[in-house]
Amino acid sequence: MKNRSYLKEYELDSDVKKIRFGKIGKILSLYENINEFQKPTIQSIRENLRTGRGYYIEKDKKIVSMAKSTAESTTHAMIVGVGTHPMYRNKGYATKCIVKLCNNLINEKKKPCLFYDNEDAGKIYKKLGFKEVGQWVIYYV
């Protein structure tokens, strides 16, 4: 990720809030509305927040977009759970959440990394400065 100047454009966006444990129910509701996501448990969301962090945008009293990290180390963090409710897409909400998350990670000298299989999401990541370093395949047994 190199395009730090683009990331700074969104840095002061007050719509983006940090996910707290009290918001887990609303996060679960968002997951239920995004077909591309597997449905997590409350416990798995809690565990994810213990090993990472997340940011969200709330509209109409519901969380409509989010981006999270997990498996943070002293040098890297995996970006996960980037998604937006279908009724609120194409408004830049996921981008704002990713930017907030990445800015915080970069300020802590951590490199954000991610996997994606959605080409539309890939376009956002590339626009933000992520670079492809390889491809991955999942084999099922």
Language-model-detected regions and their locations in the chain:
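Helix-loop element at the rim of GNAT/NAT acetyltransferase active sites that forms part
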Residues: 26-38
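Acyl-donor-binding surface of acyltransferase catalytic domains
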Residues: 1-14, 139-141
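Conserved active-site alpha-helix within GNAT-family acetyltransferase domains
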Residues: 118-135
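A short beta-loop-alpha structural element at the N-terminal edge
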Residues: 13-27
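A conserved beta-strand-loop-helix scaffold within acyl/acetyltransferase catalytic domains
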Residues: 36-83
